[in-house]
Amino acid sequence: MLKPYGNRVVIQKTERETTTASGIVLTDSAKEKTNEGTVVAVGTGRILNNGERVEIGVSVGDRVVYEPFGGTEVKTGDESYIVLKEEDIIAIVE
Protein backbone atom coordinates (compact mmCIF):
# COMPACT_ATOMS: atom_id res chain seq x y z
CA MET A 1 0.00 0.00 0.00
CA LEU A 2 1.12 3.54 -0.67
CA LYS A 3 1.68 5.92 2.25
CA PRO A 4 1.40 9.53 1.04
CA TYR A 5 3.77 12.20 2.29
CA GLY A 6 2.70 15.60 3.66
CA ASN A 7 -0.49 17.04 2.20
CA ARG A 8 -1.00 14.32 -0.40
CA VAL A 9 -3.76 11.73 -0.67
CA VAL A 10 -4.01 8.41 -2.49
CA ILE A 11 -7.19 7.83 -4.49
CA GLN A 12 -8.48 4.68 -6.16
CA LYS A 13 -10.24 5.81 -9.31
CA THR A 14 -13.86 4.94 -9.94
CA GLU A 15 -14.09 3.17 -13.28
CA ARG A 16 -16.78 4.20 -15.74
CA GLU A 17 -19.18 1.63 -17.14
CA THR A 18 -17.89 -0.15 -20.24
CA THR A 19 -21.39 -0.84 -21.58
CA THR A 20 -24.07 1.76 -22.30
CA ALA A 21 -27.68 1.41 -21.16
CA SER A 22 -28.59 0.21 -24.66
CA GLY A 23 -25.95 -2.55 -24.53
CA ILE A 24 -23.20 -0.98 -26.65
CA VAL A 25 -19.72 -1.94 -25.43
CA LEU A 26 -17.38 1.05 -25.29
CA THR A 27 -13.72 0.83 -26.26
CA ASP A 28 -11.08 2.46 -24.05
CA SER A 29 -10.81 5.41 -26.45
CA ALA A 30 -14.58 6.01 -26.37
CA LYS A 31 -14.86 5.93 -22.58
CA GLU A 32 -15.00 9.25 -20.80
CA LYS A 33 -12.15 9.67 -18.31
CA THR A 34 -13.35 9.85 -14.74
CA ASN A 35 -12.05 12.25 -12.12
CA GLU A 36 -13.85 10.62 -9.21
CA GLY A 37 -12.58 8.08 -6.73
CA THR A 38 -12.30 6.83 -3.17
CA VAL A 39 -9.62 8.03 -0.74
CA VAL A 40 -7.55 5.03 0.38
CA ALA A 41 -4.76 6.85 2.29
CA VAL A 42 -3.99 10.36 3.56
CA GLY A 43 -0.72 12.02 4.47
CA THR A 44 0.10 13.68 7.78
CA GLY A 45 -0.85 17.16 6.56
CA ARG A 46 0.86 20.38 5.58
CA ILE A 47 3.35 22.11 7.90
CA LEU A 48 3.05 25.89 8.13
CA ASN A 49 6.03 28.25 8.40
CA ASN A 50 5.48 28.50 12.18
CA GLY A 51 5.81 24.69 12.48
CA GLU A 52 2.10 24.08 13.04
CA ARG A 53 0.61 21.10 11.20
CA VAL A 54 -2.67 21.49 9.26
CA GLU A 55 -4.57 18.21 9.00
CA ILE A 56 -5.98 17.03 5.69
CA GLY A 57 -9.73 17.66 5.31
CA VAL A 58 -10.64 14.30 3.77
CA SER A 59 -10.67 10.86 5.36
CA VAL A 60 -10.06 7.32 4.16
CA GLY A 61 -13.28 6.07 2.56
CA ASP A 62 -14.47 9.49 1.33
CA ARG A 63 -15.65 9.61 -2.30
CA VAL A 64 -14.13 12.67 -3.93
CA VAL A 65 -14.02 14.56 -7.22
CA TYR A 66 -10.60 15.89 -8.20
CA GLU A 67 -9.05 18.08 -10.90
CA PRO A 68 -9.07 16.11 -14.19
CA PHE A 69 -5.35 16.59 -14.81
CA GLY A 70 -4.24 16.61 -11.17
CA GLY A 71 -2.00 14.06 -9.54
CA THR A 72 0.26 11.26 -10.63
CA GLU A 73 -0.88 7.77 -11.58
CA VAL A 74 0.96 5.06 -9.64
CA LYS A 75 0.63 1.31 -10.18
CA THR A 76 1.35 -1.24 -7.47
CA GLY A 77 0.79 -4.82 -8.52
CA ASP A 78 -2.56 -5.03 -10.29
CA GLU A 79 -3.91 -1.83 -8.70
CA SER A 80 -3.72 1.70 -10.10
CA TYR A 81 -3.95 4.79 -7.89
CA ILE A 82 -3.80 8.57 -8.22
CA VAL A 83 -1.55 10.45 -5.77
CA LEU A 84 -2.45 14.13 -5.57
CA LYS A 85 -2.20 17.16 -3.34
CA GLU A 86 -5.16 17.95 -1.11
CA GLU A 87 -5.81 21.23 -2.98
CA ASP A 88 -6.48 19.25 -6.19
CA ILE A 89 -9.62 17.77 -4.58
CA ILE A 90 -12.69 19.70 -5.73
CA ALA A 91 -15.45 18.13 -3.61
CA ILE A 92 -16.49 15.28 -1.34
CA VAL A 93 -19.42 13.26 -2.73
CA GLU A 94 -22.06 12.57 -0.06
Swiss-Prot record:
It is found in: Cytoplasm. It comes from the Bacteria. Transmembrane segments: none annotated. InterPro entries: Chaperonin_GroES (IPR020818), Chaperonin_GroES_sf (IPR037124), GroES-like_sf (IPR011032). One of its GO terms (molecular function) is unfolded protein binding. NCBIfam families: PRK00364.2-2, PRK00364.2-3, PRK00364.2-5. Belongs to the GroES chaperonin family. This is Co-chaperonin GroES. The lineage of its organism: Bacteria, Bacillati, Bacillota, Bacilli, Bacillales.
